Amino acid sequence: MAEELKNDYKISFRGDQGRVAHEFIIDLNEIKKTTGITEEDVAKRLMDYGFHAPTMSWPLVGGLMIEPTESEDKAELDRMIEALKKIRQEIRDVETGKADRTNNMLKNAPHTLRRLMSDKWNYPYTREQAAYPANWIHLRGKVFPTVARIDSAFGDRNLICSCPDVSDYTQGYDDTISMKV
């Protein structure tokens, strides 16, 4: 995957032979400087393509760790490569002025069903471009995010559990163990 993407993104932490391990890091720091597009923007846009957002800013601040699992087949890896290449083109559209620096598919990602189905659509791109940026998404399907953006850093520092009290999980539970010998 890193070889397929090397002309589109800076790949960090290559070995002496120019190879990467089973995961690789896309360095978005230069893109961030020139366009304002962040690693979070790219991660959120991947959700519009139907992919789980990758690890952000670890081990490289401003990077994305792409770590496909062994259970992914070649077709799925190829779709992710295509998604990342299409996202790179969306970034180029910002670089060239074809897309606005603040009101674009990356800055507004992910696109929730609620937003897509709203009567109000004040974006310079179509709902189709937002929700189905690649043709194969119609066939493959995807899970739409239910929440667009949150303040991730605030949430990380101010975690509040909204779970029921632990005692709610133990009501009606018989903790005796019966063993037949």
Regions found by a protein language model. Give the residues of each.
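Non-catalytic terminal extensions of PLP-dependent enzymes
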Residues: 2-181
